[in-house]
């Protein structure tokens, strides 16, 4: 029998429709040194209904089509984030900041996979801003605490490409910003 060797890799094309995102918020100063804010962010995750991959190497494309992994259904739903923040001005050159937001998972367990994880996050952030003449320095740290999600391996699979397992995610995001006023 002839043996066919599968190429070690293949270039690919992937079609992804990114969602519409709309946000709005309000802020006010209950006292001169304290700024409080609240935002609402709506994301149309339902636009990201599936991800289609086309492998340019024909052997890979055939293999992936046969396994039904060329199309990954996501079945994501629209989601709304709620965000709250505070900035306290210590003096004319220093501000302290803190925030919190809740970001619900847009995807169901039936389509959960490691390529596009979907977790509900509770995020907290802290920061400090320092003004030196016309130079503004800002430092921040954000910690996203993702919930743990367990996807089972249904027979038959609800969605090709779903990956059974328990997934958790925590993200730490440091930020630095330097700006200058002319």
Where do the language-model regions lie?
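Outer-membrane beta-barrel porins/channels
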Residues: 1-182
